[in-house]
Amino acid sequence: MTMIKINQSLNQPLEFKTDCLILPCVENKKVAGELKEIDQKLAGAISQAFENKRFGGKSGQTLLLNTNGTMKAPYLLLVGIGKVKEVTPEKICQAAATAAKLAEQSKFKTAATDLSPFDALSKGKSGLYGDLAGAIAEGAGLALYHFDNYKSKDEKDDSPSRLEKLTLLIASKSRQASTEKSIARAEKIISAVHTARDLVSHPGNTVTPTYLADHAKKMARTNKITCKVLGKKEMEKLGMGSLLGVAQGSDEPPALIVLEYYGAAKKKAPTVIVGKGITFDTGGISLKPGAGMDEMKMDMSGSATTLATMQLVSSLKLKTNVIGIVAAAENMPSGSAIKPGDILK
């Protein structure tokens, strides 16, 4: 798991050296605001795009232009964020994802985003600036996820181009603290989501119940989390017949994983998250169709979400109590597999 590096800089967008300058633009019928100055530098290229309806700031719209040496960044990428009254962190997140993907597809190594439009958008709305700044970082980081763990590498082949760094440009020192806080929070969210994606992306012969249990133990050691894993004998004593029944056709032992995070007084009732962890579901005796069965490795997506959520809750140091439970097993057909109609004890 490799995450894009995200930082901030107190700098003027047109004077900042980067491969691509990204400007979030609200929906408009014509060029307005700071775009006027840039449009003049680019000989009216932006105005022409507005007139031809190639770009107008609508959500999801993009316009990539060569700046021809008129500014420090050789390329300018405009990304639409929709009508000014309808701008939300979610829309900013989506716009950032769109821009980041296009920047990477264009083989840019670095990019910078101007946050100055957020000053006006968040005026009179406490905390909104930080939410919008965080949404930029989060959207870019989540969009640029890659899972290359099992891809062979040929020395003759060029490495895939990756956008390695995103700089958030701020116009005032007063925004530094909130922007830094927003970046840090976004990076924790990105890391947790990447954890879930990685677990789901690995094949079934890698992610077994034991693998999930080991992952949980390792995560607990590096976070403020306690971890307890129940094995087959402990589950038998507790009468967990359903989970044991699913697992009895497999050579892989089942595991019941319990993670506990206490960020509030222990007497406060916790939120409990339960994640399904069937690391491969063949259907057992009632075998599923062969076509697409490889996707049954994803029957543990609930467990991946639970583990990632516990990671995030701890890293954010939330002032609440959360318990995560994962029932992990492998469902395989064999002479010892559970049969339809069996009574479980």
Residues of each region from the PLM?
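Alpha-helical metal-binding/catalytic segments enriched in His/Glu/Asp
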Residues: 216, 271, 287-330
